[in-house]
Amino acid sequence: MLIKTSCNFVQRLALICLGIGMFTAALHAFAQATYPNKPVRFFVPFTAGSGTDIVARTVADVISKSLGQPVLIENRPGAGGTIAASQVAKSDPDGYTILVHSSGHALNPSIYPNLPYDTVKDLWGVTPIAALPNVLVVSPARGWKSVSDMLAATKAAPGQLNYASAGMGSATHLNAEKFKLQAGIEAVHVPFKGTPEALSDVIGGRNDWFFAPLSSALPLIKDGKLQALAVSTAQRSQALPQVPTTVEAGVSGSDYVFWVGMLVPSATPAPIVKRLHDEVIKALALAEVKDKLNRLGAEPMPMSPEAFNAFIKVEMDAAAKIAKAAGLKGS
């Protein structure tokens, strides 16, 4: 009797567990089928007005209309983007909390040894959104008309001039470090919370130079508040065709591309990842989005999730080499 009762109990327990499992699976399937049924949040790890923020906002409105739900931009600056990345990595993998990060995402593992998340295992790339140049800008008051002028002044006072970035480990920081290594110069790094703050200090003459996202710096260049010396990409920008590349300006191997991409927690269901990917690709194909990106000096950068995640690993390897050569360490 005892054995029979025990068997019945085990059978009932197994049926209960099976029922719970089926119910949970049904809930997940329902959630995916009805996605999205509430606002979606884009976590941007830099301040409003930064290059990453501008690109995120360019596609957010279009995606919001297509999804039928608000897409809210939440700026979470700090620690080179690792604060926002950590928050997204630890969020529910349901497609409602999304990271819109820059190429600095690939550098952070090399300079922050104790990240609270694994860049590859905890976050899954959906697609890059856009690639854009950084532009080397200085205050017109400096009197530097070319990269050669700036390099001459820097080499004449090694370690005395400074340069701004949008934060330790940001794409603007990595760009500057690569340029420094290739140019053979010494300068002091001054990190800020975001691009607008860094630009303000360069305009005010408190910082000597800055590789700023072209999307943020372009209006200030056109207004004469900043002098553009070179763009970071291998080819000139259509937005500033008269401005040479850093390679054309004489610093070989200094080209750098600032990309902005979308990532989600790695456990996010594949159908939701596909939906988000498809929405971005649709947005990038629209003439209005292409026009906005073009005016920012940016270009659409569509990729499949698989290609994007492979690309991130390649970028991590390249960033690690720069970080090691430059001796970069985060706090």
Model regions: which residues?
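N-terminal secretory signal peptides that target proteins for export/translocation
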Residues: M1-Q11
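An extracytoplasmic/periplasmic, membrane-proximal ligand-sensing/linker region
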Residues: L2, N37-P39, L181-A183, A270-S331
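Bacterial N-terminal signal peptides
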Residues: L13-A25
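Sec/Tat signal peptide C-region and signal peptidase I cleavage site
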Residues: A25-A31
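N-terminal (or domain-start) structured segment
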Residues: A31-K121, Q160-N162, G184-F211, P300-M303, ...
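Hinge/capping helix and adjacent helix->loop/strand transition within the periplasmic-binding protein
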Residues: K90-Y96, S110-E197, W209, T246-E248, ...
